[in-house]
Swiss-Prot record:
Coiled coil, from the record: none
Protein name (Swiss-Prot/TrEMBL): Chromatin protein Cren7
CC per GO annotation: chromosome; cytoplasm
UniProt keyword DNA-binding present: yes
Domain of life: Archaea
Organism: Pyrobaculum arsenaticum (strain DSM 13514 / JCM 11321 / PZ6)
Localization of this protein: Chromosome; Cytoplasm
Family: Belongs to the Cren7 family.
Length: 59
């Protein structure tokens, strides 16, 4: 599942612009008692790094 997330391209919106990017890192964030989400880290063409939730996990 991790390779699917890292090899897929996602649409990231930042500063009013939209980018189609591949994540450089992804991880699961799941607080106790709540459904988890997959957060991915993206590097924009201008060098900035942004995070985005790319998937929600079932409870």
């Amino acid at each position: 599942m991790a390779e699917e997330i890292l090899n897929r391209e996602y649409e990231v919106e930042y500063g009013g612009k939209r980018y189609i990017l591949r994540p450089i890192k992804a991880w699961v964030l799941q607080p106790p008692g709540k459904p988890g989400v997959v957060v991915a880290l993206f590097r924009l063409p201008d060098g900035k790094t942004v995070r985005k939730v790319v998937m929600k996990l079932p409870p």
